UniProtKB/Swiss-Prot annotation:
Source organism: Borreliella afzelii (strain PKo)
Family: Belongs to the CTP synthase family.
Annotated residues for binding of L-glutamine: G355, L383, G384, L385, Q386, E406, R466
GO biological process, one term: pyrimidine nucleobase biosynthetic process
Gene behind the chain: pyrG
Binding site for UTP: S16, K190, S191, K192, P193, T194, Q195, K226
Reaction(s) catalysed by this chain's protein: UTP + L-glutamine + ATP + H2O = CTP + L-glutamate + ADP + phosphate + 2 H(+); L-glutamine + H2O = L-glutamate + NH4(+); UTP + NH4(+) + ATP = CTP + ADP + phosphate + 2 H(+)
Binding site for CTP: S16, D150, M151, E152, K190, S191, K192, P193, T194, Q195, K226
Subunit and interaction comment: Homotetramer.
Binding site for Mg(2+): D73, E143
The protein's name in its UniProt record: CTP synthase
Pfam families attached to this UniProt entry: CTP_synth_N, GATase
Length: 533
């Protein structure tokens, strides 16, 4: 462990889904210019990673350059800290138990009874300190998933309690994000849930240094004093985290409330946050939110419409473009399971995102056909590219039975599999972490929309797929007006397609939304919106 390593631990209380990831990323941003900050997310589920979890249940799966499939909070970490995270930074209980069982089989515990304490907590600690060492970290931001009191995160809570004992109280600070409700009809803020949450944390041996109150309005002085008294913190250490028009306001709000000063005092360090550029971009977002200079309406035609977080990074990509083009983008998620052309008539542009399986498949094809025939700016992502190829094959090339091998029925081969399984996938049976995953180079063809947007002929983008365009059909597609504008580095796999005669009809096999930054929006989203103006 590095000497003078500083650690910030963020826990959540009352309810989940109130923004621990954004809160953690916002605090980390205040320290990123003065310290080498490494964010760590601890998840209590027994999955090795979220790669096989339904997005409707857990939110989108975020893919890293190293091929790791991690929690969506890593999207916030990367975007707020402008770094490329590593899959090892996402510690799941599934990974920990797997390592414990492997160690036991190898005899590393020398015949001792393997127990939750000390063996599991020691493994978590070892993993955390290994990350700090390998990254030469000066500060760790450790976010513990779920809420205090959940059975799933008890061992993570116990681990950070032990870490405090080992590193000393001057090198670690505990931040508790809680929810202060204002029940409808009562019109009064209630502190009792926060009190109970903090008491649960106290029983585990942790006493927060900072309480961040998630609420719809600024806390009243009365509630602030009440929380301070019952939770044993200074009233100045209770921070407002109210509803905002954009999450990029939150680091600025924390800065204005002196979060960095409170934590710096606790850790005996100096920090000088730089928020000028972020403040400028947030100012543009807010001004257009209230008095828009121009409004662009975008349809996101997705199959996981039950949960907005299923497409969180696409939403963020559009926010980044809006800030840089000084306009307002209104995005609407349309369920592709129940989509017809009338749903699309009021939109300036259409996005068809990724997904798996046949559900919602034909609805997406309807959206693609509508965009192509009506010259509406279109961006297809991953499955969106594959379905764009199928739509073109059916409705332009006349291959009416064109389809993907993903829809293959056993013992009934497709006559025209214009999308087929990647060769390296044919012998793979396991589902978890077996796709083409992570950052790969893409070679762009000159004089194409993609080349003009990127300004270079070689780019790195992130992938998550098993299927590809069948090269046997590419000549036919190009004769009919659909070109391949980007290939894999060996020129064997189509990665980008375009229809040059359309204003903007582009689809990519990769996920451009995974590398967007507010200071540097993803190029394909930028091109889409510019085409809509």
């Amino acid at each position: 462990m590095k000497k003078n390593l500083k650690i910030l631990v963020i826990t959540g209380g009352v309810i989940s889904g109130i923004g621990k990831g954004v809160t953690s990323a916002s605090i980390a941003r205040l320290f990123r210019y003065d310290f080498r900050v490494t964010p760590i997310k601890c998840d209590g589920y027994l999955n090795t990673d979220p790669g096989t979890i339904n997005p409707v249940e857990h939110g989108e799966v975020f893919v890293l350059d190293d091929g790791g499939e991690v929690d969506m909070d890593f999207g916030h970490y990367e975007r707020f800290l402008n770094l490329n995270a590593k899959s090892s930074w996402n510690i799941t209980m599934g990974k920990i138990y797997k390592k414990i069982l492997e160690n036991e089989r190898k005899g590393k515990y020398l015949g001792r009874t393997v127990q939750l304490i000390p063996h599991v907590t020691d493994e978590i600690k070892s993993t955390i300190f290994q990350i700090a060492s390998s990254e030469n970290s000066e500060m760790l931001i450790i976010e513990i998933g779920g809420t205090v009191g959940d059975m799933e995160n008890i061992l993570f809570i116990e681990t950070v309690r032990q870490i405090r004992h080992e590193v000393g109280s001057g090198n670690i600070a505990f931040i508790h994000l809680t929810y202060v409700p204002s029940p409808v009809g009562i019109n009064e803020q209630k502190s009792k849930p926060t009190q109970q949450s903090v008491k649960t944390l106290n029983k585990a041996g942790i006493f927060p240094d900072l309480i961040i109150a998630r609420s719809s309005q600024v806390l009243t002085d009365q509630i602030r004093k009440k929380i301070a008294m019952f939770c044993n913190v200074e009233s100045t250490s209770i921070i407002d985290n109210i509803d905002v028009s954009t999450i990029y306001e939150i680091p600025i709000s924390f800065y204005k409330q002196g979060v960095h000063e409170i934590l710096s005092s606790k850790l005996n360090i100096k920090v000088d946050p730089k928020i000028e550029e972020l403040s400028r971009l947030v100012g543009i977002i807010k001004s257009n939110f209230f008095v828009p200079k121009k409004i662009i309406n975008i349809a996101i035609c997705g199959k996981y419409a039950e949960l907005d977080d299923s497409y969180a990074s696409i939403r963020e990509s559009l926010v980044h473009v809006a800030a840089n083009l000084d306009l307002l983008i209104k995005s609407t998620l349309i369920d592709s399971n129940d989509l017809n052309e009338s749903c699309l008539k009021d939109f300036d542009g259409i996005i068809v995102p990724g997904g798996f399986g046949g559900k919602g498949y034909e609805g997406k094809i309807i959206a693609i056909k509508y965009a192509r025939e009506n010259n509406i700016p279109f961006l297809g992502i991953c499955l969106g590219l594959q379905l764009a190829v199928i739509e073109f094959a059916r409705n332009v090339c006349g291959i009416l039975d064109a389809d993907t091998e993903e829809n293959l029925i056993k013992d009934k081969p497709l006559k025209n599999p214009v999308i087929h399984l990647l060769p390296e996938q044919k012998e793979i049976k396991d589902k978890g972490a077996t796709m083409r995953l992570g950052g790969y180079p893409v070679i762009l063809k000159k004089n194409t929309i993609a080349f003009k947007l990127y300004g270079q002929d070689r780019i790195i983008e992130r992938f998550r797929h098993r299927y590809e365009v069948n090269n046997d059909y590419i000549d036919l597609f190009e004769k009919n007006g659909l070109i391949v504008s980007g290939f894999s580095s060996d020129f064997k796999i189509a990665k980008l397609i375009e229809i040059p005669k359309n204003k903007f009809f582009v689809a990519c096999q990769f996920h451009p939304e995974l590398i967007t930054r507010i200071e540097n929006p993803a190029k394909l989203f930028l091109g889409l919106i510019k085409a809509c103006i």
